[in-house]
């Protein structure tokens, strides 16, 4: 007997988008499945994980959103080994994760609408409290941390991106473009270029280091993405957008040109169902929070 799993209308629409992209140009990076994380060190199941963060020391941190906790793992030679659970009362609904240069964790809580700071051992250190001029309260939609531990906070309510140093002092403010759909993420590359992602129009805007405004980067990639919600850059300058509803990754060049898609919809290892965040390490390993499959997957990425 054949058993079919129900697919909602958004995924059906997304399949059309994925098929439309299949005839596009050759991709610049290929992803190969390496490992899958379903459980913690005590054999407990993950529940709708939305966040992942990793570093070059082999540390992987997962925001196990449905269980209101963080989980740490060690990564070595393609194997992922569970380590510890981090569960603090100051985190109710962790969704986005970043690690700073010291292994400290920064976590966006969607319910509290705050970014929490935890040390490398998981002890709560307080909430990020930015004080930009003329703004009563910063309400983060998303954020990133760069190699110098500078913080980039997207506040869609204020229609701005705030840049702060490691002490929390605001050093720059970038207004969001007025002619846009819905900004979902901010990113920064190794050269200090700041990017914002418009999910509705599937466009990326960029601001060079020291710039005071965003400019459009290339054309819309809406023909190849259904609803991109997360953006990051690899160490070769390729931008990767997580297409949440399209269950895949869209690759863009430094000029915003479309380079191709990777991964697709499904429930077996190597396939995705409503992915939310991706992190990359210097070795080329990629970790994807595969939210609706209740797992995190590890891929090796190979330049093509």
Specify the residue positions occupied by each region the protein language model found.
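Bacterial N-terminal signal peptides that target proteins for export
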Residues: 1-12
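A short helix->beta-strand "capping" segment at the edge of beta-propeller domains
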Residues: 27-45
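Beta-rich, blade/repeat-based domains predominating
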Residues: 42-56, 89-101, 133-148, 178-192, ...
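Conserved beta-propeller blade signature
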Residues: 59-62, 104-107, 150-153, 193-196, ...
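Short loop/turn segments immediately following the C-termini of beta-strands
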Residues: 65-66, 110-111, 156, 199, ...
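Structural signal for beta-propeller blades
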Residues: 68-70, 113-115, 159-161, 202-204, ...
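Short loop/turn segments that connect beta-strands within beta-propeller blades
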Residues: 74-78, 119-123, 165-169, 208-212, ...
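Blade-level signature of beta-propeller repeat domains, shared across WD40, Kelch, NHL, RCC1
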Residues: 274-304
């Amino acid at each position: 007997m054949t058993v079919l799993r129900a697919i909602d209308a958004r995924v059906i629409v997304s399949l059309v988008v994925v098929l439309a992209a299949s005839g596009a140009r050759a991709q610049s990076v290929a992803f190969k499945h390496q490992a899958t994380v379903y459980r913690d060190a005590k054999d407990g199941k993950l529940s709708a994980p939305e966040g992942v963060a990793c570093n070059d020391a082999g540390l992987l941190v997962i925001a196990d959103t449905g269980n209101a906790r963080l989980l740490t793992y060690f990564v070595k030679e393609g194997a992922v080994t569970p380590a510890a659970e981090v569960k603090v009362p100051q985190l109710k609904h962790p969704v986005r994760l970043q690690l700073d240069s010291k292994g400290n964790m920064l976590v966006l809580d969607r319910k509290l609408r705050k970014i929490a700071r935890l040390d490398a051992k998981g002890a709560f250190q307080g909430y990020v409290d930015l004080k930009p001029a003329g703004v009563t309260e910063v309400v983060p939609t998303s954020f990133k941390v760069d190699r110098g531990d500078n913080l980039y906070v997207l506040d869609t309510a204020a229609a701005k991106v705030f840049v702060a140093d490691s002490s929390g002092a605001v050093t720059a403010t970038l207004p969001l473009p007025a002619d846009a759909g819905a900004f979902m993420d901010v990113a920064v590359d190794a050269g200090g270029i700041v990017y914002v992602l418009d999910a509705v129009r599937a466009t990326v805007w960029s601001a060079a280091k020291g710039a005071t405004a965003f400019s459009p980067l290339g054309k819309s990639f809406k023909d190849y993405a259904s609803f991109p919600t997360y953006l990051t850059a690899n160490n070769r300058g390729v931008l990767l957008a997580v297409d949440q509803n399209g269950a895949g990754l869209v690759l863009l060049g430094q000029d915003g040109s479309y380079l191709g898609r990777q991964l697709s919809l499904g429930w077996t290892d190597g396939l995705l169902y409503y992915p939310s965040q991706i992190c990359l390490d210097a070795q080329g390993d990629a970790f994807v929070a595969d939210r609706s499959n209740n797992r995190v997957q590890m891929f090796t990425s190979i330049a093509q």
